Amino acid sequence: MIKIHQLTKTFGDRTVFSDLNLNFDAGKVYALIGNSGCGKTTLLNMVAKLEPYDQGSIQYKGKDLRKIKPTNYFRNELCYLFQNFVLIDNKTVSENLDLGLIGHKLDKQKKRETKEEVLDRVGLSYIQLDQKVYELSGGEAQRVALAKIILKDPPLILADELTAALDPETSQEIMDLLLTLKNKERLIIIATHNPTIWKQADQVVSLKISQ
């Protein structure tokens, strides 16, 4: 699904990647590991079209990523989970979930039922749809973010230190939920320092700080 060929990325005088070659196949969960500064987040950002690269290429489904329109990519192909989630704090849970339903032709009642069903799936049946996101705990907010992904149903999921601010038990629960989203047509790439998380991936990619 994603092919990275001879990728080079620099920040000023510092080289992050030099002639990097990687393949990521659909149907798998990959974990990016390595010390701070090795380029895990930078690599995710480049795959997400949030960070340019200097040389080389990234192909997504056989197409040059640079030639794919960002609006189409974000709307139809990608969900990117940051440490601070992909939610709007001052909006309600319902309003955030609406962003995962863009393009779905549902009447008001069906839309509400769909949101309630997906919240139940991620263990948040007790959450009110009109509750503001900033009122939620970190674990609850992560679950809402995953609920939004379930609604959007993207072929590519990127996650950057998804559970870094959570306790071990909640981290495992969030990872378990993320793994339920795995299917043969979806690629999931997770950047993490947590051995408990990366040991559950299908494949581990170890990045090193360039000399």
Map each language-model feature to its residues.
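Conserved ABC transporter NBD signature motif
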Residues: 56-64
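ABC ATPase NBD coupling module
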Residues: 65-79, 183
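Catalytic Walker B motif of ABC-type/P-loop ATPase nucleotide-binding domains
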Residues: 157-160
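Helix-to-loop junction immediately C-terminal to a conserved catalytic motif
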Residues: 48
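Conserved ABC ATPase "signature" region
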Residues: 109-127
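Conserved ABC ATPase signature
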Residues: 132-136, 140
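Conserved structural motif at the start of ABC-family nucleotide-binding domains
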Residues: 2, 17-19
